[in-house]
Regions:
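Glycine- and acidic-residue-enriched helix-capping/strand-helix junction motifs
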Residues: 17-32
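Short acidic/histidine-rich motifs immediately flanking catalytic phosphotransfer sites
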Residues: 68-74
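Short acidic active-site motifs
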Residues: 60-64
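N-terminal nucleotide-binding beta1-loop-alpha1 segment
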Residues: 8-15
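Short beta->alpha junction loops
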Residues: 51-59
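Extreme N-terminal starter segment of soluble prokaryotic enzymes
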Residues: 2-5
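Flexible, gly/pro- and Lys/Arg-enriched active-site loops
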Residues: 79-82, 87-138
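Single conserved hydrophobic/aromatic residue that forms the stacking wall/gate
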Residues: 140-157
């Protein structure tokens, strides 16, 4: 039996975790978050493998989403600042029909008003935010892909 493959995408400035605003994002680096997720998945989900991609470039993120269409069983995205600005990432998410979850370390609704809206939320099945690095592992308590694969995505219009 082949393993399911989950693609994680981390957007701009997430490579600065541990240095950038630790009072908001915590002290763990992105590499430490990824190692924690890999360990958690290996211990609890033998049938799942994970891959991580981080970019500060919108186009690179769009390309990674497109590639995930044919390679991944699911996609987890922390769009960072692009969550609040990127129609291009939303459109890319709407082109793939695998289960998708948006995650954020901070609670967007306790932050500045401009962070309260995420364009990319329309292109995913669910959103997890506000649990710091634990947001990356909480998604494994969400419904399985078979539970959400039949749900309809809203129109981008």
């Amino acid at each position: 039996m082949s393993k399911k493959f989950i693609q994680f995408i981390d957007g701009p400035n997430l490579n600065m975790l541990g240095e950038r605003e630790p009072e908001i994002y915590g002290s763990m680096t992105l590499d430490e978050v990824h190692k924690t997720v890999k360990k958690y998945v290996a211990q609890n989900y033998k049938e799942i493998d994970v891959n991580f991609f981080q970019s500060n470039s919108e186009g690179d993120i769009v390309d990674c989403i497109h590639k995930s269409k044919n390679t991944a069983s699911g996609l987890i995205i922390n769009g960072g600042g692009f969550s609040h600005t990127s129609v291009a990432i939303l459109d890319a998410l709407l082109t793939i029909e695998i289960p998708k979850i948006e995650i954020h370390l901070s609670n967007l609704f306790r932050r500045e008003d401009f962070r309260h809206h995420s364009y990319i939320s329309k292109g995913v099945h669910g959103v997890i935010c506000g649990f710091g690095p634990n947001s990356y592992c909480l998604l494994y308590t969400s419904p399985s892909p078979r539970d959400i694969s039949g749900s309809r995505m809203p129109s981008s219009a």
